[in-house]
Amino acid sequence: MANRFVLNETSYHGKGAIESIADEAKGRGFKKAFICSDPDLLKFGVTKKVTDVLDKAGLDYEIYSDIKANPTIENCQHGVEAFKASGADYLIAIGGGSSMDTSKAIGIVVANPEFSDIRSLEGVAPTKNKAVPIFAVPTTAGTAAEVTINYVITDAEKNRKMVCVDVHDIPVVAFVDPDMMSSMPKGLTAATGMDALTHAIEGYITKGAWELSDMFHLKAIEIISRALRGAVENTPEGREEMALGQYIAGMGFSNVGLGIVPVSYTHLTLPTNSRV
């Protein structure tokens, strides 16, 4: 049986990566962005780093900030309606896993309206159409959601999380800019960094691993192991290497899966409402 490997069409890495957003949008003929970003990122000026790029280029956008930790079915449904009303033709996800997951759900449902009941997307989703194009701008170095084919939505009614796996949801372009992560506090940097390291280790030992995924996971372990302490201290070098290391881990585990750790914290984070 052949092994499949799914990645972004394009990705930008390093300081100033977000400066390429305008060129990518114009080059693809996009007219208006629907920006998914949580209220804290708006409050502390992180989202503004991206909107400044769009403003400078004269590109239109609308900001949707009703992003919750552990996004629920209802959150995503509201997002779908807001997207439809906005007149946007692509999404920009700014944030950690929650913003990315919300954007993926919105993009998939808009492009595949027959799956408007998000519960029908749980597991390996049988969608036929690619999601509305997503530009992903991570602000944490942990989940690597900008390069993965899965997203997690909470069913609040049943108090459970649904993992949705769909090759059609992967962002078309990722902009992995360490400057977007520089405002993370030490505790969050450490926690997301360990999340990334766990992804790399589990991806390497999972049953689905093979030579190509091994290459990514081993390199990710190497980079994260030397970079995490520096990232916690907010050194430019540490931030940049962690941004790259967690992305490389995502390139691997998105294609071969993980182990028991994500299953465990899926249940542990429901009461605390945390998603990094």
Regions found by a protein language model. Name each.
Residues 22, 51, 62, 77-80, ...:
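Predominant activation on well-ordered alpha-helical scaffold segments within soluble catalytic domains
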Residues 1, 76-88, 179, 236-265:
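Short, hydrophobic/aliphatic alpha-helical segments
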Residues 74-81, 85-176:
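Glycine/threonine-rich beta-strand-loop-alpha-helix active-site module
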Residues 266-272:
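Conserved small/polar residues in nucleotide/adenosyl-binding loops
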Residues 42-115, 227-239:
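N-terminal small/polar loop signature for handling phosphorylated ligands or for N-terminal nucleophile
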Residues 1-64:
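An N-terminal, well-structured beta->alpha segment
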Residues 150-256:
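Carboxylate- and glycine-rich phosphate/diphosphate-binding segment that chelates Mg2+/Mn2+
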